[in-house]
């Protein structure tokens, strides 16, 4: 448990909540319900074993913070609890609620034990894959998905490894549970991208040989079907830049060809290549806090993922071709 003041608001609360959800208990010494709620929250912090952290803020001593949070949520009484996730206040409740109701509240925002283990296994698998220990990485990713089927990044990493091993059937099976999220008005770009990746791998064996496609393109640079098929073959085996080079040739000559299929596939490849933004660390916010003493920002600062020069280069190429 930590006590929050204006001095450590950014470093301990905002930056800290980027690592683990933090439940802020706004209380006062004269408040009877606050005294009843406090021990319940402390017990829950112990029961949840690190899945969230409890912080306390004395409303009498820290009126600026308490006032801004109360205004933000339209609350005028205490005890008032606000949960911070990823540097942001996302939800809250008022009053000394029963333990069961507080658990329901926490479970909406706090990762399950399985989700935490799944995330750790995903990170370990990424390192194993980078070290060439593919079999061990596959085992860990399969276990990570079993623990938390909602761990999309574990699913994507598993799809990548399976396709790299030339196993599109298994990759398609891993993709199937999220396939519905790749279509319709609310289609998710990252899910759609991996759907195109799997489809490319499934269709590649039925396409004409690369040597034949290359000859057709040499004879007719506007043979977009041959060029797209060649791009699909490159995409299927992870030759991403080669695939985008072929797609770019189509886009530069006919942006609208086949309902913008070349552009859509190009964007999908960029998405597959892009790593998810890592969790923000506390260091930038801590450094910023030293320069911002006395200034209260309810929303936290976040890191921007370091740029991949290859991805940046191909984004620029696409932009130039389109505009």
Residue ranges and their predicted role:
Residues 3-22, 218:
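A short beta-strand-turn-helix
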Residues 6-14, 42-111:
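Thioredoxin-like thiol-disulfide oxidoreductase module
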Residues 26-40:
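Conserved redox-active cysteine motifs that mediate thiol-disulfide chemistry
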Residues 124, 158, 195, 230, ...:
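Structural register within alpha-helical repeat arrays
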Residues 149, 182-186, 220-222, 238, ...:
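Short coil turns that delineate tetratricopeptide repeat
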Residues 154, 171, 188-191, 226, ...:
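TPR alpha-solenoid repeat register
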Residues 166-173, 189, 194-211, 268-315, ...:
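Alpha-helical linker/edge segments of TPR/alpha-solenoid repeat scaffolds
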């Amino acid at each position: 448990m930590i006590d929050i003041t204006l001095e450590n608001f950014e470093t301990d609360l905002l930056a800290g909540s980027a690592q683990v959800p933090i439940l802020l208990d706004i209380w006062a010494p004269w408040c009877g319900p606050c005294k009843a709620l406090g021990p319940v929250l402390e017990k829950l912090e112990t029961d949840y074993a690190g899945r969230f952290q409890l912080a306390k803020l004395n409303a009498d001593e820290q009126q600026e913070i308490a006032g801004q949070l109360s205004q933000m949520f339209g609350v005028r009484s205490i005890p008032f609890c606000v949960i911070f996730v990823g540097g942001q206040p996302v939800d809250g409740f008022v009053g000394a609620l029963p333990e069961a109701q507080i658990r329901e509240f926490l479970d909406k925002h706090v990762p399950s034990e399985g989700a935490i283990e799944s995330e750790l296994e995903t990170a370990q698998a990424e390192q194993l894959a980078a070290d060439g220990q593919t079999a061990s990485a596959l085992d860990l990713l399969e276990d990570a998905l079993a623990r938390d089927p909602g761990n999309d990044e574990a699913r994507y990493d598993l799809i990548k490894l399976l396709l790299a091993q030339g196993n599109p059937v298994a990759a398609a099976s891993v993709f199937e549970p999220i396939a519905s999220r790749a279509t319709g008005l609310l289609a998710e770009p990252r899910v759609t991208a991996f759907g195109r990746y799997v489809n490319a791998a499934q269709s590649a064996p039925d396409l004409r040989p690369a040597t034949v496609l290359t000859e057709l393109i040499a004879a007719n640079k506007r043979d977009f079907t041959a060029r797209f098929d060649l791009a699909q073959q490159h995409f299927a085996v992870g030759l991403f830049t080669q695939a985008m080079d072929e797609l770019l040739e189509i886009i530069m000559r006919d942006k609208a060809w086949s309902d913008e299929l070349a552009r859509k596939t190009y964007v999908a490849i960029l998405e597959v290549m892009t790593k998810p933004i890592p969790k923000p660390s506390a260091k930038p916010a801590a450094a910023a806090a030293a320069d911002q003493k006395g200034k209260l920002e309810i929303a936290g600062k976040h890191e921007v993922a370091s740029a991949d020069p290859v991805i940046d280069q191909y984004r620029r190429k696409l932009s130039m071709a389109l505009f």
